[in-house]
Amino acid sequence: MHPRVLEVTRRIQARSAATRQRYLEMVRAAASKGPHRGTLPCGNLAHGVAACGESDKQTLRLMNQANVAIVSAYNDMLSAHQPFERFPGLIKQALHEIGSVGQFAGGVPAMCDGVTQGEPGMELSLASRDVIAMSTAIALSHNMFDAALCLGVCDKIVPGLLIGSLRFGHLPTVFVPAGPMPTGISNKEKAAVRQLFAEGKATREELLASEMASYHAPGTCTFYGTANTNQLLVEVMGLHLPGASFVNPNTPLRDELTREAARQASRLTPENGNYVPMAEIVDEKAIVNSVVALLATGGSTNHTLHLLAIAQAAGIQLTWQDMSELSHVVPTLARIYPNGQADINHFQAAGGMSFLIRQLLDGGLLHEDVQTVAGPGLRRYTREPFLEDGRLVWREGPERSLDEAILRPLDKPFSAEGGLRLMEGNLGRGVMKVSAVAPEHQVVEAPVRIFHDQASLAAAFKAGELERDLVAVVRFQGPRANGMPELHKLTPFLGVLQDRGFKVALVTDGRMSGASGKVPAAIHVSPEAIAGGPLARLRDGDRVRVDGVNGELRVLVDDAEWQARSLEPAPQDGNLGCGRELFAFMRNAMSSAEEGACSFTESLNGWR
């Protein structure tokens, strides 16, 4: 193992000792009760099986076969989740064939950030992660189940499913993806039309035609945003079957992987003599493995929030400092849009997960000695699935990249360091996705222009007020202010300014989409402005340095003057309409971005 990876892992283990121990005690107490439906009073159990067929009723009464919960984020507006419509039938059939039972335990909400970008609904996006976690807990709280299958793909859905199911860590749990849609027009072409539209050089009809040629079929969007990062990290955690992440939907291989996930969940139950609860899989080593994979592929910045919240749900204390230290020793091995021109289907064809995991294991950057849903040891994830006469089998994946413009071996990385940079200075702490920014654009020092929402920046751009070197500051966008929306709609405007030769950067206490790139952006700045963070002291014209090379985020103002400044008050309008008022209690409970921007942080860490 690489000494820095070991050092960071041991530090996390030491820091987490108390909370992890308390978590494991909770899990063991739940596991010791045996099949939970066996402890239910007769009337309660009768309610739980009332809608089952006679065969399933008899199986569930005997308590000697697994009852597998299906928790699904299906809806047919969200392209990535539309394929889940068929999955419960496939799962139940596969379980019946081995004498087990599957029950649809509950549905969880799934919103599409692509639909809500720049709209009021985006202010519910991050909160939806915590709603999904609570919905998962409600689904599993009936205590009818011996194992669980979680069906989810997209941005906040998988983190929410993870947080919720980890609170039922005594259950063996397998995550079931749907797979990416086939490749449409190139991401480069799509981005170019967006930028032309921002400049007034493309019509709305041309923009819509471009967008619909990109997002065109059931399955996950093909850029390397949060949804595909979710799949990659869950597989590296050992919660997917090997190679399951990026098989296209509605194919024979995808259907057989879904059936096998159901069978495997049943095999991992005490009833089948091979008990592997989720809590044994998601430990400190698995969390470190997920961070390493995130860094090696330049994954979504949203996971600098989500991984912290997921770790907390397992009693593990992960920090941005841990991620930063790992970023200095983990090389960048993948170039997927927005970090390059390839999409996730090209990544899969170039060698995909099996090649990536093999390289990171051989380089001592991943812990091999972990438990997974496929069995002990991460080395089994260097295999890939295929069908042999209709039967699902695994073979060794490629030992060399099939396209080094997309995926490279450890000895020829795209960069010696990972794709994320911790930003620090007198403006607070934040993160930057440097893998998506050309080296010549990673350092910007310029006067600031301050905005309190995306619409104001767009209006200033259209009025020609931003034609200069510029650090755009969009503040009061943090978790407690307005739910920390993504500010992805700013990317075309700032990209135009950069292409015109201006030095441009963004600084915000909000988020950017995992699809954002090109323009240097110090995001998730903490403390947020509404909590008295330094961004609230900034004034138009202040000179700010955003240095993605050295991780510096600093206002160049005399210290005495800076400390004497008053804090700008937060805008009083907003947070009303589109249901936003219903989430006020959740915003008030949100922890800082550095703590995962999570409404559960205080209660989960209360065990410390």
Curated annotation (Swiss-Prot):
Keywords noted in UniProt: 4Fe-4S, Carbohydrate metabolism, Gluconate utilization, Iron, Iron-sulfur, Lyase, Metal-binding
Cofactor remark from the record: Binds 1 [4Fe-4S] cluster.
Cofactor: [4Fe-4S] cluster
Chain positions recorded as [4Fe-4S] cluster binding sites: C154, C221
Any one biological process term the GO annotation gives: Entner-Doudoroff pathway through 6-phosphogluconate
The protein's Enzyme Commission number: 4.2.1.12
Catalytic activity: 6-phospho-D-gluconate = 2-dehydro-3-deoxy-6-phospho-D-gluconate + H2O
Example of a GO cellular component annotation carried by this entry: cytosol
Pfam families linked to this entry: ILV_EDD_C, ILVD_EDD_N
Keyword Electron transport among UniProt keywords: no
Pathway: Carbohydrate metabolism; Entner-Doudoroff pathway
Gene Ontology molecular function: any one: 4 iron, 4 sulfur cluster binding
Family: Belongs to the IlvD/Edd family.
NCBIfam families associated with the record: edd
PANTHER family in the record: D-XYLONATE DEHYDRATASE, PHOSPHOGLUCONATE DEHYDRATASE
Functional note: Catalyzes the dehydration of 6-phospho-D-gluconate to 2-dehydro-3-deoxy-6-phospho-D-gluconate.
Cross-referenced HAMAP family: Edd
Protein name per its UniProtKB record: Phosphogluconate dehydratase
Source organism of the structure: Pseudomonas aeruginosa (strain ATCC 15692 / DSM 22644 / CIP 104116 / JCM 14847 / LMG 12228 / 1C / PRS 101 / PAO1)
Gene name for this UniProt entry: edd
